[in-house]
């Protein structure tokens, strides 16, 4: 799009470079392995990342000719100390006033004392008095959220005072942010499929109807985590026996039965999308997502999504005319054919649903919105 950019990330698996680091130009791995390890170890006691800053980027940014946009995304997850980031932004703005700060919020971390995902908890509305779970990401041994929440929110107010513009892919995260920091403080640009994935999807032939029993997909990074994959619901689907064929994609599947096919974790996006393309539906039961791209990707290749009630799933499905359902309804819907599922969830034919979804989740639309946003800063 003609905009020069650099991408700075914390670390990849094991504190090393990301596996895709060499695939892109102008990429910087930022956080030393020891910093990440120290943060991981100490976060469980302190409920915040103690180490990590952007200070070594100061000269690069302030010596760049012309206006600069610093666009932040996920700043938690053991690579940066929030207070250090805010102080860095103050220093940069004082030295180079034509730096603009932008922050895309991919979860609820900006409104809570600790958690990135609320998992139905609304304690943040009353100052995180007592955390109902210590396991919600990022997990801890001791709950200090109530002690930290006021100071953390003050740092976000300081970012707003520096002129930082906040964006979220989802309405429900933007609403939560605006309820604390003021109406209109966070605007919405929905996630879209990245251009490389969109090219893969364009090559996949549409599968109008599969042969045999319904093939149902469940996708998660770690299939053991109940927040992402409702374990009881999957077991109830398994209990349907030869009425369905259940396909899991992800690590550590605890599901074994005669009607289950465990594909493991697929790092090759083309292979994953090709496999999903053969499915009659994707069942989504996560309670801890914001605007999940796996839904956008499945819908874009014409695979109906059967999702249990959550703000995230509701918002994504509504964009293509779909709805969420109860767990009881899931067990009925997974026994239907692909066209019948499309009709039940999206109220239209499979062909019309596919066409509608391909347009709704286009990465090109997201890209154009961001470029327009940058150009109007």
Identify the function of each model-found stretch:
Residues 124-166:
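Membrane-proximal helix-turn-helix segments that form the acceptor-binding/catalytic region
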Residues 204, 339, 343-376:
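A charged, aromatic-enriched C-terminal amphipathic alpha-helix characteristic of glycosyltransferases
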Residues 209-251:
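Conserved catalytic-core segment of nucleotide-activated headgroup transferases in glycan assembly
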Residues 273, 295-300, 311-315:
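Short alpha-helical segment that forms part of, or immediately flanks, the ligand-binding pocket
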